[in-house]
Amino acid sequence: MKLTNISRLAAGVALALGIFAASAHAGEPLVIHIGYAAIGVDNRPYSEGTSAATARAGEYLEKEFANDPNVKIEWTFFKGAGPAVNEGFANNQLDFAYQGDLPSLIGRATGLKTKYLLASGARKPLYLAVAKDSGIKKIEDLKGRKVALQRGTNGHLAAIKILQAHGLTERDLQVINLDSAETVAALASKDIDAAFGDTDLINLAAKGSADIVYTTKGDDPRFGRNAGIIGREAFIDAHPDITQRVVDAFVKAAQWSSDESNRGALLELWHKAGTPIPVLDEFFRNDKLAYRNSPLIDDLLVSLYKEQAVKSKEYGLIRRDVDLNGWFEPKYLNNSLERLGLKTFWQPYGADGKPVAS
């Protein structure tokens, strides 16, 4: 055989192998990796208190792609909360995630290419629980005491704002960086004096092992926490149609979670995370479901994120300015609201916190 024929044969084999490899790759399912900046009791792969938690427990995304065998949904819940989600985005291991305001702003400041697609878990209250017989009755009593919070989370930023409003800073406290499970154990054993958090602390108080002495409920609404569904820019650009369907699924979950007639069923669904239903009931007491589960990127939400960005730098949590221009991407949300007939379902709020007339 001549050399030229050998070369042609080799080229043909290489071409065939290349086509085979490309076909095999094309036949591989698209795995949509979704992160959640929290985890359930005893590391259960569920959470509670947000429409994103509803989407997971109610399998809204799985149902959205049920007739697409080449699309798979994979959830990851992070004990390390928002900072761990940023690592997932940085390593291209996540396509979408539920994440709080501070860690998503930190990600933005450090150059992560993400987009804010819709709100989920916005306007969440924060609680201060204290150990039994600690003598702590109010925020000012925290001075010099051991106080737990999870650094780098939206609860961290909210706690600093609350302290500042009461004449304190982090430096006035002995701050202990603990996750939720560690906080509960330390507070129950009185290894710490107090802690900032939410349902885990409500549950601990219900058992008689701690006392709730403060909540942002009924206080300045800007002390609350915000969160949303964040998307990786490269995935969004490569798969706009898939992104639209992902947002559709989250909006459907938000709609169901906002219907007062579903309140009992909603708490039951969130109970998959291991949080007792009475605790969830207390967490949402006197709050309208539609207020807490709205997906809207309204003026109030945007203004709060801008304020958080400024405060984060002021408090030394972020070293540089955070450019939010172009980060909020309401296109997919607006399409969902139009397609699902939900344009007037949720009440938008202005930057002043007041309802905007429709």
Please state what every model-predicted region is.
Residues 312-358:
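Conserved C-terminal helix/tail region of periplasmic/extracytoplasmic solute-binding proteins
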Residues 28-52, 71-77, 144-148, 174-176:
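Short, well-ordered beta-strand elements
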